[in-house]
Amino acid sequence: MALVHKLLRGTYILRKFSKPASALYPFLGIRFAEYSSSLQKPVASPGKASSQRKTEGDLQGDHQKEVALDITSSEEKPDVSFDKAIRDEAAYHFRHLKDEIVDHWRGPEGRPLREVLLEQAKVVWQFRGKEDLDKWTVTSDKTIGGRSEVFLKMGKNNQSALLYGTLSSEAPHDGESTRSGYCAMISRIPRGAFERKVSYDWSQFNTLYLRVRGDGRPWMVNIKEDTDFFQRTNQMYSYFMFTRGGPYWQEVKIPFSKFFFSNRGRIRDVQHELPLDKISSIGFTLADKVDGPFFLEIDFIGVFTDPAHTEEFAYENSPELNPRLFK
């Protein structure tokens, strides 16, 4: 046994074989091969040679005693229970599913369902901590080789979100792209129990409500519909938001009837109303072709019911453009 240990700790095998386990497996078996892999280390320095010789001498002197090989120590092989991890994950998702069912019948956050159905305003996103920023993602033309940069952080006193960066309309030098210059902030798609996609239902509201502070640039507000069809992933409903600039906050109210339908960045001739019962995400895009720094500070994003607004859809359709609406 001591001879085996000496072979495993020796520099000859480590020098000749990059994986001693593969070299010793036919002779010593799998348990000793695993042990050899746990002992594989660089060649000892001169300062450590004496301690190594001492260890080898002790083993040679006690060759008649059994050497206990601790191949299952907690440091080398941590105790990981996959069964427990699976049980904990399943229990978490079932608790989440239970909360969804209870909220659907009783009302979110313990409020009566009647009160929820009759509410006139609702804050969907607000920014009071880092966990609120994690619900959003930022992107720019840098993903296609552009030079625009965009960042997102908490504002002053952790009471708002600050979107800032630099816009550059210089096209990438790839021989294909001819236009560039955009920055965007997009909300992440919410997930329910068992990682199901969850959509927002705004069918009882008619207006988007924001409290923002900007630098005078125009932004595009984009709302996406929840869909499982790949062909519709580039479809969205958009409208403009104009910031005033200056140090003061402004309240922006955009009726949902004003949002126009577009696909792959092009406004379609055939227009559709925004399906308010299956909203997937909302985003803000800057692409005004004015190079330079920018910022947009957002306090909250919500929806409310404006009783003075009775318009259902702002855009005209005709039988030639959309015959399905006139059947």
Swiss-Prot record:
Pfam families: CIA30 (PF08547). It comes from the Eukaryota. Residues 53-63 have a biased composition (Basic and acidic residues). One of its GO terms (biological process) is mitochondrial electron transport, NADH to ubiquinone. The keyword Phosphoprotein applies. Belongs to the CIA30 family. This is Complex I intermediate-associated protein 30, mitochondrial. It comes from Pongo pygmaeus (Bornean orangutan). The lineage of its organism: Eukaryota, Metazoa, Chordata, Craniata, Vertebrata. The gene is NDUFAF1.
